[in-house]
């Protein structure tokens, strides 16, 4: 259904913005604005600052993207008060 193939890149969430939008720093050093994909929204997958994610970019606009996957191994540190 897509006209062009999308570009998938790895990155790290740098900042959380309103309306489930995030700033993601990609492996190549570029910073893009990305939103959560519909499947991640449907399954209530939470994304926090510092999470490693996979971002899908279109060749038309390389400054905006869609977060399609959150790496399971990258968890934010927990506080001692919770233990």
Curated annotation (Swiss-Prot):
Pfam families xref list: eIF-1a
Any GO CC annotation of this UniProt entry: cytosol
Keyword Transmembrane assigned: no
Lineage: superkingdom: Bacteria
Assigned keywords, A-Z: Cytoplasm, Initiation factor, Protein biosynthesis, RNA-binding, rRNA-binding
Domain annotation S1-like: ranges: 1-72
GO MF annotation list: ribosome binding; rRNA binding; translation initiation factor activity
Compartments, as annotated in UniProt: Cytoplasm
Listed transmembrane segments: none
SUPFAM superfamilies: Nucleic acid-binding proteins (SSF50249)
Family: Belongs to the IF-1 family.
PANTHER family cross-referenced by the UniProt entry: TRANSLATION INITIATION FACTOR IF-1, CHLOROPLASTIC
Record note on quaternary structure: Component of the 30S ribosomal translation pre-initiation complex which assembles on the 30S ribosome in the order IF-2 and IF-3, IF-1 and N-formylmethionyl-tRNA(fMet); mRNA recruitment can occur at any time during PIC assembly.
UniProt function note: One of the essential components for the initiation of protein synthesis. Stabilizes the binding of IF-2 and IF-3 on the 30S subunit to which N-formylmethionyl-tRNA(fMet) subsequently binds. Helps modulate mRNA selection, yielding the 30S pre-initiation complex (PIC). Upon addition of the 50S ribosomal subunit IF-1, IF-2 and IF-3 are released leaving the mature 70S translation initiation complex.
Protein name: Translation initiation factor IF-1
